[in-house]
């Protein structure tokens, strides 16, 4: 009988990550180091452990708005080419060390121009850092493919410019577009021009929707904006009636989301921190998985949530009793939903993900 997944063995499993914010995944030591180099004096702590603890504690706020406040510090130390390159390089290293074989990492270029960099400078530097990180990881025997999503802040008015940026860099490592930030009062339909531009150029995009706000945000993202994926989308559970015996009935919105196989970029630990759910055990991930939605496992912000893909998977295993076949399905779901070309997705699934999961399950295909 195949042994149940443990944290130690999960660390060996290949992973595909679709929802990870570059400015939410810095190493605490890097934040301190760059802050010293650039003269940023507003950090809440000057010790690595104390700073890591502050980010973690501050992010357990119970609201999305308060959860986003610590980003002012990470963004402040990501304003120079040297800092952006380093953060991107280390991001690739950290993900590869956790056996992530494919990642789409997102960031908002508009947050990194306060020291005079242009949008193109920012994106080019980050992509260069990712490429160098990929090369270093391959040399260390931990190959990873890292691609980029450029994000527009939903409370600002730069989404069309950022969409154009995505198209300019589409053959250089940017595979899609996103909008992020506080949902309440900032519906995705305010950015229709950007989404139409992406569709006009046959490009892919995801939308943060259904995280802190409810079904209207999801409906707009799908029906009016045409999102290829949903960032979080956890509130779709509000359109599912669950019986006392565990049976369920999908509402119209939930049904179309499932029927169209629109991927959900679920981030369990982050959802607990922002108050979207009370605990991992109460997270609707398992309900959505049993209902055969295309669920994927993601980190969101590794620094703020003090997490990794392995930890996210292990927490789900502990909460819902998942086995290797479940983790393999969630991983294949993510790889199927990636924004790279079909043949590249298939190659990673068939040549990397399936064989390595088969080995972990004690048999070969």
UniProtKB/Swiss-Prot annotation:
Binds 1 zinc ion per subunit. Transmembrane segments: none annotated. Zn(2+) binds at residues 19, 21, 208, 300. Gene3D superfamilies: Metal-dependent hydrolases (3.20.20.140). Substrate binds at residues 21, 23, 181. The active site is at residue 211. Coiled coil: none annotated. The keyword Hydrolase applies. GO terms for molecular function: 2'-deoxyadenosine deaminase activity; adenosine deaminase activity; zinc ion binding. Its EC number is 3.5.4.4. GO terms for biological process: adenosine catabolic process; hypoxanthine salvage; inosine biosynthetic process; nucleotide metabolic process; purine ribonucleoside monophosphate biosynthetic process. It comes from the Bacteria. The record marks 232 as: Important for catalytic activity. InterPro entries: A_deaminase, A_deaminase_dom, Ado/ade_deaminase, Metal_Hydrolase. GO terms for cellular component: cytosol. It is an enzyme of class 3 (hydrolase). It catalyses: adenosine + H2O + H(+) = inosine + NH4(+); 2'-deoxyadenosine + H2O + H(+) = 2'-deoxyinosine + NH4(+). SUPFAM superfamilies: Metallo-dependent hydrolases. Its cofactor is Zn(2+). Keywords: Hydrolase, Metal-binding, Nucleotide metabolism, Zinc. Belongs to the metallo-dependent hydrolases superfamily. Adenosine and AMP deaminases family. Adenosine deaminase subfamily. Catalyzes the hydrolytic deamination of adenosine and 2-deoxyadenosine. PANTHER family: ADENOSINE DEAMINASE. This is Adenosine deaminase. It comes from Mycobacterium tuberculosis (strain ATCC 25177 / H37Ra).
